[in-house]
Amino acid sequence: MEEMEEELKCPVCGSFYREPIILPCSHNICQACARNILVQTPESESPQSRRASGSGVSDYDYLDLDKMSLYSEADSGYGSYGGFASAPTTPCQKSPNGVRVFPPAMPPPATHLSPALASVPRNSCITCPQCHRSLILDDRGLRGFPKNRVLEGVIDRYQQSKAAALKCQLCEKAPKEATVMCEQCDVFYCDPCRLRCHPPRGPLAKHRLVPPAQGRVSRRLSPRKVSTCTDHELENHSMYCVQCKMPVCYQCLEEGKHSSHEVKALGAMWKLHKSQLSQALNGLSDRAKEAKEFLVQLRNMVQQIQENSVEFEACLVAQCDALIDALNRRKAQLLARVNKEHEHKLKVVRDQISHCTVKLRQTTGLMEYCLEVIKENDPSGFLQISDALIRRVHLTEDQWGKGTLTPRMTTDFDLSLDNSPLLQSIHQLDFVQMKASSPVPATPILQLEDCCTHNNSATLSWKQPPLSTVPAEGYILELDDGNGGQFREVYVGKETMCTVDGLHFNSTYNARIKAFNKTGVSQYSKTLVLQTSEVAWFAFDPGSAHSDIIFSNDNLTVTCSSYDDRVVLGKTGFSKGVHYWELTVDRYDNHPDPAFGVARIDVMKDVMLGKDDKAWAMYVDNNRSWFMHNNSHTNRTEGGITKGATIGVLLDFNRKTLTFFINDEQQGPIAFENVEGLFFPAVSLNRNVQVTLHTGLQVPDFYSSRASIA
């Protein structure tokens, strides 16, 4: 069970979890540590101005998109995105175990009560110390996070099995050894904390203080607290919401947001998730067994390499001694090469042993932790963490299956010495390759008839030469950054076809492929030049739009079912080049003021475009228009829209500007400057307006000529 200890320690304080709570990202943290890493945000970032709460966050943040990309937008334009809504950037520190920790928002309260129950500063933000995802707390503060009763039970059992000394639960820094436990408060104290937080006077004088060992026994014998609903603290969980994947109480079903969701019996889902976790553990257990056998094989390889090295050196010395008069100078050079090869092989094998040992220890720890979790009889507590554990188990199992259990180095020295040449040819004496049975694979051939580009995606296909007899274990596809920069790996695997998304529009990329096996890698294929689409073709995105938006015409036409303004985004984001699209007004009743422009992916969807700091827009009625960003209105311009009007939006990253047009005439000055980052086309409207999107358009001639003059 020693490997499991990593699963039981808080990433902030490095000690065993004390009163752990579950963050929305499924990671755990001590209640006291959660309070210490709270950060108070400015009023402009308050929950009223952002779609975030203690139990919910917005989908993405454009800063996180750039930071979490496989490669930055400036470098290549393709990558993998994801993350919580970020809090404002805050200087970070390093905790003892190397995770990111924000500075305390305020001094910890000096009270004998649980720190998480004290008041939380208004507009507080907390960042997960493991995945660095952030969210803003609602009025409930830390009480909005469920407590991990299952983890508490596992820690109690682990500490009992280790007979570990009980620590004080209120020490601000390194916890000292506890000297007493209050049976009423259920808290362990050291002497200084007891005198400061639990003085023997007033109501506390009636509390019973017992030795820590006796307190541990009484705590173990007392029934464990049942997990309660975070929204209704007096109610126990009674059902499981299938849509939200969380236990809920009966009040949530009758009054809360789960009233229209599908629910199932708590006990049935508890058994189902236990069964799923057990099945996942079976597969991971097999991988762990294979890993142990693989480590034995690697350790044997070290001995074999040592023996083969000695044998090879002896053979080399014997051959050199026969030609000693002519080979003295050459012998030293050859021995140096053998030693270098020897050290290289050992280094590769030892590095792989170290890597596999760490991975196996982590896998074993996860397995032991999961087995302990399965022993728990708290259905709601188990269901709070089961989905995350199942995903972790599957992910760990997949990681073992990606060529991890294959030696990276052979034990043989693929060298031999040819001593047949005459003495006058000694200066040409060198090692020759003898292991012709294991050559590298042949160079792959790109199948040009199957390679193509569509919009900002590229599909490439390749194959081995028809007469090749050496099998390839996999392929490595490389692309440059679209600006003639260095090549970077974008795919490694056994497939012979790959589609790369997220490239820049109107850009030229170079692609090449090579094959590999245990012996090494092949030569690169011929370089293929790929040209992405000059203009962007896209539609509106139903997945990110407000639920009141109504789509038609293959998602090119939108209107709304509400009298309030609702936001819809385009499916394609831009960060480079010049892009132009138009929207025609199909219906315009009662003089509303729709807004057109660009926005980040996490823009607010239930207010007019431009009300928050994630959108840059022009809103217009039948007489005039305004530019708006972060609820700031500028540049009132005469001239409005009617049914049949055309609104043009021009996003120019070369000049870092955003410009608007109405009926082919520029509306006002340049709307916004210094435009940088990842932007999505955006519209806000109500039920009185219907618009149709037109894409794949060239930049207007009058703008191009004006730009060339400038």
UniProtKB/Swiss-Prot annotation:
GO terms for biological process: proteasome-mediated ubiquitin-dependent protein catabolic process; protein ubiquitination. Residues 374-432 form the COS domain. The keyword Disulfide bond does not apply. Its EC number is 2.3.2.27. Its main location: cytoplasm. InterPro entries: B30.2/SPRY (IPR001870), B30.2/SPRY_sf (IPR043136), Bbox_C (IPR003649), ConA-like_dom_sf (IPR013320), COS_domain (IPR017903), E3_ligase_FN3/SPRY (IPR050617), FN3_dom (IPR003961), FN3_sf (IPR036116). It comes from the Eukaryota. It is an enzyme of class 2 (transferase). The modification Phosphothreonine is found at residue 41. Zn(2+) 2 binds at residues 229, 232, 252, 258. Pathway: Protein modification; protein ubiquitination. Residues 533-702 form the B30.2/SPRY domain. A zinc finger (B box-type) spans 163-212, 224-266. E3 ubiquitin-protein ligase which ubiquitinates itself in cooperation with an E2 enzyme UBE2D2/UBC4 and serves as a targeting signal for proteasomal degradation. May play a role in regulation of neuronal functions. May act as a regulator of synaptic vesicle exocytosis by controlling the availability of SNAP25 for the SNARE complex formation. Interacts with SNAP25. This is E3 ubiquitin-protein ligase TRIM9. It comes from Bos taurus.
